[in-house]
């Protein structure tokens, strides 16, 4: 278990995936915020700055790429690490966005948790507690 001071924002338009990821992260001790599209994620981040964003790539209203662009344009958000999730071939996404980490849906739970932990460990925002 990790301290509940680390907050992960999970963004996915598929309710079942959103709830499953939120439950899994809570079981691991993370504080979890959820959003069903990018615009809702930005609204959540206006209230609480997460230590990590885990976002689906293809969503209605505001998709993953547009969400990431908005995060990078905002000085108060740009240092938050973002992990992308997609049902499409993530190798192509990795070539387009080499600085980002991506998970292929369906993903291995252990691989997901290792990537979340590694991203949080590398983030000074999360380490400040």
Predicted regions: what is each one?
Residues 1-7, 108-129:
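Non-catalytic signal-transmission and effector/linker regions of two-component phosphorelay proteins
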Residues 12, 56:
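Active-site residues of response regulator receiver
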Residues 19-27:
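Charged docking surfaces used in two-component/phosphorelay signaling
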Residues 34-52:
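Acidic, metal-coordinating helix/loop segments flanking the phosphotransfer/catalytic sites
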Residues 59:
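Receiver (REC) domain active-site loop signature in two-component systems and cognate sites
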Residues 83-85:
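Hydrophobic/aromatic residues positioned on beta-strands within the core alpha/beta folds
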Residues 105:
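A Lys-centered signature of the CheY-like receiver
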């Amino acid at each position: 278990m990790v301290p509940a001071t680390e907050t992960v924002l999970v963004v996915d338009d598929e309710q079942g995936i959103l709830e499953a990821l939120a439950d899994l992260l809570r079981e691991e001790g993370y504080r979890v915020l959820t959003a069903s599209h990018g615009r809702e994620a930005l609204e959540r981040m206006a209230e609480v700055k997460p230590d990590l964003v885990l976002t689906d790539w293809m969503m209605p209203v505001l998709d993953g790429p547009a969400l990431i662009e908005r995060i990078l344009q905002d000085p108060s958000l740009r240092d938050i690490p973002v992990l992308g999730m997609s049902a499409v071939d993530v190798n192509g996404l990795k070539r387009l966005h080499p600085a980002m980490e991506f998970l292929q849906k369906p993903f291995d739970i252990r691989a997901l948790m290792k990537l979340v932990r590694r991203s949080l460990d590398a983030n000074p925002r999360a380490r400040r507690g």
